């Protein structure tokens, strides 16, 4: 698999596989997953050439980190990039909060019986990293991201104060760890292109993970954030490139777009993209993945999986050669931003 390299602000070098493994689904995302399958999924990633493994305390309240660590136990540490996030502290004695109706809240069916508590402070970041290392079973992380500090997660009233808390607290902590080379790189993991811009301008970050805002269906990240990331020399890890499902499944009944049933306008657009893909003998899933990989600011596309076979499919689709005429036909049909960089 293609490898992409970048150098962090502290001089540390990182090598990314074009396709990474996102471990959110291993935290019992939407459905329970047995331990053996979860660990085998991570092990298959290693065997298939995946070298980027991303997690978060949020995923199953720490369960995904634990499973990822078990799957990486025999990995050669200097040949993989391990990423996790801060912003939530897991309390084994706390009450789980009620789901708020004013924010998007994709559900976990299982996970550890711990209560998450938002904390973007200096001490909270340090504590979160310590807890993550214990769950994963490592003595260091390569990348640490400020997680979900956006309107998507906190609602409009709380997003601003949370941003200020993160920049005054967590960012200072992460910058200290980076300067001391305890971590190689620091960044943020956000669901909104505008908030990515806000963070990129506010701090001196190495990497960013943007979810769902650069895909075949949503190219809002192309307008300002991706050019800004290139200008600042940031590596971009893309997540959510299938927009939570529909670009992987195609226009099947009940297909999901951004964690909800896709509206008719999205279904129609997907059907039109599928037709162009059929003419070029590729799947919409392959096109969605290859489109994301093609942007020069992107160092890795992080893909979820719940079985070893899904990992194999991800790696295969990340390596399929796309005909240049596919992209030109999509642009001619106004199904793709004409300014979007493409390969082939």
Q: What are the roles of these predicted feature ranges?
A:
Residues 1-101:
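N-terminal binding-site loop/beta-alpha segment at the start of enzyme catalytic domains
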Residues 4-5, 37, 149-344:
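Beta/alpha (TIM)-barrel catalytic core signal, keyed to glycine-rich beta->alpha loops juxtaposed to Asp/Glu
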Residues 15-19, 49-51, 76-80, 138-142, ...:
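Short, well-ordered coil/turn segments that N-cap beta-strands
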Residues 22, 32, 56, 144-147, ...:
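Conserved residues at the C-terminal ends of beta-strands
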Residues 24-36, 110-126:
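Active-site mouth loops of central-metabolism enzymes
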Residues 94-107, 251-255:
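Short, flexible, mixed-charge acidic loops at enzyme active sites
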Residues 119-140:
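An active-site-proximal structural segment forming one wall of the substrate-binding cleft
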Residues 133-156:
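Active-site groove signature of glycoside hydrolases
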